[in-house]
């Protein structure tokens, strides 16, 4: 949770203003997040991002940032994940999330992530990094075999991956 707070509080200043304190806090956020995913694993946002890196030479962090809103919408359909999103929103300054329905929680969190990405100049679609719809089947096949896939909170099929890539266009 602390890593998410630090990212929301410091990413724009670190990127746009080159504020050294914000840069240092982003380093701390990276460290904390790394400890977290070392313990619980990753999910399909990484499975999908690995394929964009391999096929289109997209930097991993950029691919994750572009894909995250789409994958959050997908994973948020799991009630336990929607509840976790609600808890995160309440912790990062949106206490009203406690009273929102699951779909509004998902929409709010996805919007916040998208706005944060836009605020630091991150492109919003995989088309912008060269992705082609005719490659989605191949990308999905590779994502199905990715070692991060089992860490996802929802089961995902090849068809789901294709649709998620399509939504990220």
Can you describe what each PLM-predicted range is?
Residues 3-4, 26-34, 68, 113, ...:
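Short alpha-helical scaffolding segments that buttress acidic/His motifs in well-ordered protein cores
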Residues 2-5, 9, 50, 66-70:
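Residues on a specific face of well-ordered alpha-helices
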Residues 23, 103-106, 158:
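Short, structured helix-loop boundary elements
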Residues 55-135:
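Gly/Pro-rich interdomain helix-loop hinge
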Residues 31-64, 146-151:
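Glycine-rich phosphate/pyrophosphate-binding beta-alpha loops
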Residues 1-40:
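Carboxylate- and glycine-rich phosphate/diphosphate-binding segment that chelates Mg2+/Mn2+
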Residues 132-169:
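Short, amphipathic C-terminal "tail helix"
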Residues 4, 45, 64-65, 85, ...:
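A general structural signal for well-ordered alpha-helical segments in protein cores
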